[in-house]
């Protein structure tokens, strides 16, 4: 079980209370698909992903980015038991979708980068530490089925 300080919980809840899912989600997933092109193999049904412009303008990528970001709400609502909260998604991604678990970390990093760009100076070192701790726990939970 992860121990969360009151400060960490406050920071994480504050981030999500102001999060623009429709902006951050598509940008983060697009960034992941552009920067790490091998991750595109999981999105073959999304249509044209041939270049950065196509990825950024792809409605399926945008919709899935929003869905992924809303998936973090599951962790937010279950801070005391994030592993169990993601057990079903871990199984889905490992057994049915066969997603490389390293991709969760790559997407997590992209979410953090896009969030940092959006928050600017408000994305302090303390904010980053709390957010990345949260993301690391979610990534670990999603990868649990692989262990």
From Swiss-Prot:
SUPFAM superfamilies the record matches: Globin-like (SSF46458)
GO cellular component, one term: hemoglobin complex
Any Pfam family hit: Globin
Tissue: Red blood cells.
CDD domains in the record: Hb-beta-like (cd08925)
GO molecular function: haptoglobin binding; heme binding; metal ion binding; organic acid binding; oxygen binding; oxygen carrier activity; peroxidase activity
Signal peptide span: none
Keyword hit for Metal-binding: yes
GO biological process: hydrogen peroxide catabolic process
Keyword annotations from UniProtKB, A to Z: Heme, Iron, Metal-binding, Oxygen transport, Transport
Residues that bind heme b: 64, 93
Keyword Heme: yes
Domain Globin, first and last residues per copy: 3-147
Gene3D superfamilies associated with the record: Globins
Family designation: Belongs to the globin family.
Remarks, miscellaneous: This fish has two hemoglobins: Hb1 (major) and Hb2 (about 5% of the total). They display the Bohr and root effects.
Function noted in UniProt: Involved in oxygen transport from gills to the various peripheral tissues.
Protein name (record): Hemoglobin subunit beta-1
């Amino acid at each position: 079980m992860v121990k969360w300080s009151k400060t960490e919980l406050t920071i994480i809840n504050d981030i999500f209370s102001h999060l623009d899912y429709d902006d951050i989600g598509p940008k983060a997933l697009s960034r992941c698909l552009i920067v790490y092109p091998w991750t595109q193999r999981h999105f073959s049904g999304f249509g044209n992903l041939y270049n950065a412009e196509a990825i950024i303008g792809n409605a399926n990528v945008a919709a899935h980015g929003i869905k992924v970001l809303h998936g973090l709400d599951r962790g937010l609502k279950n801070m005391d038991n994030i592993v169990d909260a993601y057990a079903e998604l871990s199984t889905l991604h490992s057994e049915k979708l066969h997603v490389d678990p390293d991709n969760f970390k790559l997407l997590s990093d992209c979410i953090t980068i896009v969030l940092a760009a959006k928050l600017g100076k408000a994305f302090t070192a303390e904010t980053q530490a709390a957010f990345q701790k949260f993301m690391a726990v979610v990534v670990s939970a999603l990868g649990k089925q692989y262990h």
